[in-house]
Swiss-Prot record:
GO cellular component: cytoplasm
UniProt entry keywords in alphabetical sequence: Amino-acid biosynthesis, Arginine biosynthesis, Cytoplasm, Transferase
A Pfam family reported for this protein in Swiss-Prot or TrEMBL: OTCace_N
Binding site for carbamoyl phosphate: S57, T58, R59, T60, Q84, R108, H135, P136, C137, Q138, C270, L271, R298
List of residues binding L-ornithine: N166, D230, S234, M235
GO BP term (any one): citrulline biosynthetic process
Protein name as it appears in the record: Ornithine carbamoyltransferase
Subunit: Homododecamer.
UniProt-listed Gene3D superfamilies: Aspartate/ornithine carbamoyltransferase
Top-level taxon of origin: Archaea
Enzyme class: transferase
Length: 317
C-alpha cells in the first residue's frame, strides 16, 4: 500500500491508521540501517524545524536536533523566554508567524490544547514532542524497539505498570492499533483517560490485539513479554510527589515483580528514571533492560516522522 504522510501533523497516534504507523516504523528501520553503514540520507536539505519547549528535555531536544542534522536540515531551539507568549501574543499568531519562517514545528508543551492550537493555525506540519495527553514520538520509538527485539508486535504482551499518563496513553493507542496485547496496571484513581481506554478497546477489536486495565501489578505482568514503567510524578506534579510515592509503592518494578513475567521479558522506560522509585537498579541495569536501545530509537523514529511529514520520503520504503 502506498502511504503518503506529507503535510500531516503528528499530535496523537489515534489519528493514524495501522498502515501509516507501519510506514513510519519501516522508514525508521531503513534510516537506522543507513546511519549504521554510513549511507548519507540528507533528505531534508535546506529545511528548518522550529522546536518549542515549554518543558525542558534531554532526549527530545538532542534527538530532534541530531535528526535534522542527519537529514541535512536545521533545528531552531525556542524556549518559553524566546517567544512572545508570556507577553500576550497568542498561540495562533505564533503559529502563523513561525509558518512563514520554518518548514515544521515541534512543540513540547504542558497542555495538549496548545499543540492542537499550533496545528490548527500553522500552515506547516506540527509534531507533538510531548503533551499532558500524549507522547506519540516515544511510542513510535517503543514499538520500533519491540519490533526489533521480538521480531513482531502482533501478539506481544506489553504491560505498562504505573501512572495512567501521557506515555501510557500513546503506548495503549499504538499497541492496540498494531495488534499487541496491551495491559495497563495502575492504582485506583490513576487510570488512563476514559476516552483513551475506549480507543484502545476499539483498536484492539479491529487489529486482533487486546486491551485490559487492572489494579494488580502481579496479575498484570504474568507472562509479560514487555514490562514498561514511567515516573510516578511527572513534571508539574512535584507538589503531589510524596503522596504519589506512597500510593505507587506497590507498583514498583523490582526483581520480585519481574519474576512473574516471561524469562526473556524486556524492561522498558521512556526515561529519565527515578531509580529506587518506579524501578530498581537491578531491573533497569539487568540484561533484560533495553532502555538505551529504546532511547536511541527516539532518534530514528523521529527522523522517519520528519522525513515523511516534510516530504523527504514520499511513501516510506
Amino acid at each position: 500500500m502506498v502511504v503518503s504522510l506529507k503535510g500531516r501533523d503528528l499530535l496523537c497516534l489515534q489519528d493514524y491508521t495501522p498502515e501509516e504507523i507501519w510506514t513510519i516504523l519501516e522508514t525508521a528501520k531503513m534510516l537506522k540501517i543507513w546511519q549504521k553503514i554510513g549511507k548519507p540520507h540528507r533528505l531534508l536539505e535546506g529545511k528548518t524545524l522550529a522546536m518549542i519547549f515549554q518543558k525542558p528535555s534531554t532526549r527530545t531536544r538532542v534527538s530532534f536536533e541530531v535528526a535534522m542534522a542527519h537529514l541535512g536540515g536545521h533545528a531552531l531551539y525556542l524556549n518559553a523566554q524566546d517567544l512572545q507568549l508570556r507577553r500576550g501574543e497568542t498561540i495562533a499568531d505564533t503559529a502563523r508567524v513561525l509558518s512563514r519562517y520554518v518548514d515544521a514545528i515541534m512543540a513540547r508543551v504542558y497542555d495538549h490544547k496548545d499543540v492542537e492550537d499550533l496545528a490548527k493555525y500553522a500552515s506547516v506540519p506540527v509534531i507533538n514532542g510531548l503533551s499532558d495527553f500524549s507522547h506519540p514520538c516515544q511510542a513510535l520509538a517503543d514499538y520500533m524497539t519491540i519490533w526489533e527485539k521480538k521480531g513482531t508486535i502482533k501478539g506481544v504482551k506489553v504491560v505498562y505498570v504505573g501512572d495512567g499518563n501521557n506515555v501510557a496513553h500513546s503506548l495503549m493507542i499504538a499497541g492496540t492499533k498494531l495488534g499487541a496485547d496491551v495491559v495497563v496496571a495502575t492504582p485506583e484513581g490513576y487510570e488512563p483517560d476514559e476516552k483513551v481506554i475506549k480507543w484502545a478497546e476499539q483498536n484492539a477489536a479491529e487489529s486482533g490485539g487486546s486491551f485490559e486495565l487492572l489494579h494488580d501489578p502481579v496479575k498484570a505482568v504474568k507472562d509479560a513479554d514487555v514490562i514498561y514503567t514511567d515516573v510516578w510524578a511527572s513534571m508539574g506534579q512535584e507538589a503531589e510527589a510524596e503522596e504519589r510515592r506512597k500510593i505507587f509503592r506497590p507498583f514498583q518494578v523490582n526483581k520480585d515483580l519481574v519474576k512473574h513475567a516471561k524469562p526473556d521479558y524486556m524492561f522498558m522506560h521512556c526515561l529519565p528514571a527515578h531509580r529506587g522509585e518506579e524501578v530498581t537498579d537491578d531491573v533497569i541495569d539487568s540484561p533484560n533492560s533495553v532502555v538505551w536501545d529504546e532511547a536511541e530509537n527516539r532518534l530514528h523514529a523521529q527522523k522517519a516522522v520528519l522525513a515523511l511529514l516534510l516530504g523527504g520520503v514520499k511513501t516510506g520504503f
